[in-house]
Amino acid sequence: MGAWRPMNHLKNTTLAVKTPACRRAACRGFTLVELLVVIAILGILIGLLLPAVQAAREAGRRMSCGNNLHQIGLALLTFHDDHQAFPQGGIEVRLLRLLNGKLRYPNGRQLAWSAYILPYLEEKGLDRQLDFTKAFDSPENAQAGARVIRAYLCPSDGYSSNLVGGLGRTDYGGIYGQRITCANNPPNGCMLYDRPIRILDIPDGTSHTMIVAEDTHTDMQWINALNIFDVSCAINSAPPIENDIVSKHPGGANTLFADGSVHYLSERLDVKVLAALVTRNGGETVGDY
């Protein structure tokens, strides 16, 4: 056993013992200032990202709206193949009477074109429920007329109900003509009351002639031929009481041409160009639009 020696080698050694203050420093959380900075940064990021997310969603809704019109266009063209003409814009059944020795529909504003193409929109069952010898608002057509048809609704319209007066709403109207350059409301479009229009009746060309367009004003029903209109205003500029080309999309509206093509037209489109596009026989030359 060796001699005892003093532990001089530990004389200058300092033991690192954490005090309560050191432990508090190591475990310290966010200060209020730091928390506010983080919240501010998150707010800025959300503010930057939210418009982009909303724009992406609207782009998707606009595409879905265009797809609706594409379906309607195929239905109209198939109807034309079967009947050698597009459907009449509307037929008045209620006021059918003998005029000058012939049966006439003197005020054709009741059963709509959009009711006649139902079989071509995979709605044959609904088509069989309709009584085409009765008016749109007759008791016989009340149940069928209340059906909501998704192909007739723009996903951007934002309405809380898809019914108007108890009948299914539509956001798409047929083109009767234009009052931009012709104030007397001539029937120079493709959707007329009591008169079916053939492709041969469109000398301006089907690819240059609009047949259906968005009209998201609240009063339109797919069974009621009040869903045809003449164009009198620039796109998205008509007052609420006027049926015209109006959408809930920013900057323009979706339109369907008689060849089945769908075009998103800017609300900045010159009204004279718009007037040329909605007439079937104006003889105008239209460039890019």
Annotate each language-model stretch with its function.
Residues 3, 21-22, 26, 55, ...:
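Intrinsically disordered, low-complexity sequence elements enriched in Ser/Thr/Gly/Pro
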Residues 8, 44, 48, 59-289:
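Surface-exposed loop/linker segments characteristic of extracytoplasmic
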Residues 26-61, 71:
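N-terminal single-pass transmembrane signal-anchor helix
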Residues 1, 7, 16, 20, ...:
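Generic low-polarity alpha-helical segments
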Residues 1-30, 93-99:
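N-terminal leader/signal peptides at the extreme start of proteins
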